[in-house]
C-alpha cells in the first residue's frame, strides 16, 4: 500500500512538472507582427514575380492529358463521384469521351 501511495505521489509530481504552462510562449516581442499593404510584397522583386508568372503559364500549357482530364472531371460532381469508385480515367471516359465523339 505504501508503494502504491508513493508511486501515485511521484506520478502526480511528474504530471505537474511536465504540464507546466509557460507564459513566455504567449508573449510576442514584436510590437506589431503585421505589415501594411504597401510593404507586403516588397521583399519579392518584380523580376521574380514576372518569372513566377511565366513559369506558371508554361506549366499550364504543358500539362499532361491525364491532368486535364482530371480537372474536367473535378468540375462535374457526378464524374467526381464516379472517379472515387472507378478512377478518373474511367469517369472521364464515361462522362466526356462520348460527348466529343471519340470511342
From Swiss-Prot:
Segments traversing the membrane: none
Species classification: Eukaryota, Metazoa, Chordata, Craniata, Vertebrata
PANTHER family associated with the record: MATRIX GLA PROTEIN
Signal peptide: 1-19
PROSITE patterns cross-referenced by the UniProt entry: GLA_1, GLA_2
Coiled-coil ranges from the UniProt annotation: none
Family note: Belongs to the osteocalcin/matrix Gla protein family.
Principal location class: secreted
Positions of post-translational 4-carboxyglutamate modification: 21, 56, 60, 67, 71
Subcellular location: Secreted
Gene designation: MGP
Propeptide, residue positions: 99-102, 103
Disulfide feature: 73-79
SUPFAM superfamilies documented for this protein: GLA-domain
Gene Ontology terms: cellular component: extracellular matrix; extracellular region
SMART domains: GLA (SM00069)
Domain Gla, first and last residues per copy: 51-97
GO terms, molecular function: calcium ion binding
Gene Ontology BP terms: cartilage development; cell differentiation; ossification; regulation of bone mineralization
Keywords noted in UniProt: Chondrogenesis, Developmental protein, Differentiation, Disulfide bond, Gamma-carboxyglutamic acid, Osteogenesis, Phosphoprotein, Secreted, Signal
Changes after translation: Requires vitamin K-dependent gamma-carboxylation for its function.
Protein's name according to its UniProt entry: Matrix Gla protein
Superkingdom of the source species: Eukaryota
Residues the record lists as Phosphoserine modifications: 22, 25, 28
Amino acid at each position: 500500500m505504501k508503494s502504491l501511495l508513493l508511486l501515485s505521489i511521484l506520478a502526480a509530481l511528474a504530471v505537474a512538472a511536465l504540464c507546466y504552462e509557460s507564459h513566455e510562449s504567449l508573449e510576442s516581442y514584436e510590437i506589431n507582427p503585421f505589415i501594411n499593404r504597401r510593404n507586403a510584397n516588397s521583399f519579392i522583386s518584380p523580376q521574380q514575380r514576372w518569372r513566377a508568372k511565366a513559369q506558371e503559364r508554361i506549366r499550364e500549357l504543358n500539362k499532361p492529358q491525364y491532368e486535364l482530364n482530371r480537372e474536367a472531371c473535378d468540375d462535374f460532381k457526378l464524374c467526381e463521384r464516379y472517379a472515387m469508385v472507378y478512377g478518373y480515367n474511367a469517369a472521364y471516359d464515361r462522362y466526356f469521351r462520348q460527348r466529343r465523339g471519340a470511342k
